[in-house]
């Protein structure tokens, strides 16, 4: 199988719902482990399913590859939401 030609583009994968996209991204990342955009998209898909740990791990991995990745903004967003929730738990 010619993986590059038989595989949907990241743009197409990004349009799919999370449950369809994540397995495709998992396979894509086997062949392209340093693709920060794929990691960011997978992180966003995980976030949409409330898989917070997996999302943050993907964002951090993307940032190791490319410190200017859009994962930077996604991670800041995730941290701000988690900080908000933690404050509510401490100060009901």
Q: In which residue ranges do the predicted regions lie?
A:
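Helix-start (N-cap) detector for alpha-helical repeat units in TPR-like alpha-solenoids
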Residues: 2-3, 36-37, 69-70
């Amino acid at each position: 199988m010619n993986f590059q030609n038989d595989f949907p583009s990241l743009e197409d994968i990004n349009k799919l719902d999370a449950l369809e996209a994540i397995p495709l991204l998992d396979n894509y990342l086997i062949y392209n482990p340093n693709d920060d955009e794929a990691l960011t998209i997978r992180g966003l898909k995980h976030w949409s399913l409330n898989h917070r740990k997996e999302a943050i791990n993907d964002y951090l991995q993307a940032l190791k590859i490319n410190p200017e990745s859009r994962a930077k903004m996604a991670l800041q967003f995730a941290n701000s939401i988690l900080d908000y929730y933690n404050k509510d738990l401490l100060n009901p």
